[in-house]
Amino acid sequence: GGSAEAVVADATDEVATKELFARAGDNLDLAIYNTGNNTPGRIIDMDADFFANSWRVCCFGGFLFGREAVRQFIATQHGGTLLFTGASASLRGRANFGAFNSSKGALRNLAQAMAKEYAQDGVHVGHVVVDGPIAGEKIKRGLPEYAERLGEDGMISIDGIVDGFVYLYRQPPQAWTFELDVRTSKEKW
């Protein structure tokens, strides 16, 4: 009974983020922050720009997006749902992924702080841990041998991820979930 629109924008640009929410209008009741730059790199070989960019995309962009979503939800006085896409990196460090691990962990902490700060305003903030490779074009085109080795059962289905987001969106305020993990039955965790 509603409509949704996926928008690609520079999450690290404050003006672009404000324009995004201005364009969304007063009927906004769901906003999903889904960015990431899961690129490996050894910390001692990493330049500062690489590390800072991971933080800008994952955490700073999440701050800008979350702030504008909550401002809009509060201004319309009907609340809303703000969801952040996390990863297993949100919960634990992994060798050769220090930039990504730390920035996704920071995003999770930001989401948790926002959940506690704005629940009283009717804003449901959630964090979805996507734990494993996603069965989408990015992995199928970029790493075809890896995708073939995993098989469809070894990658998280996009429909399954969407189901998780919809589950959180539909929750009543008397039973809000903050964090939901999505993974295949084959994922070792």
Where are these regions (language model features)?
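Substrate-binding pocket helix/loop in short-chain dehydrogenase/reductase
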Residues: 42-43, 50-55
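A short, exposed helix-loop element centered on a Lys and neighboring polar residues
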Residues: 66-67, 112
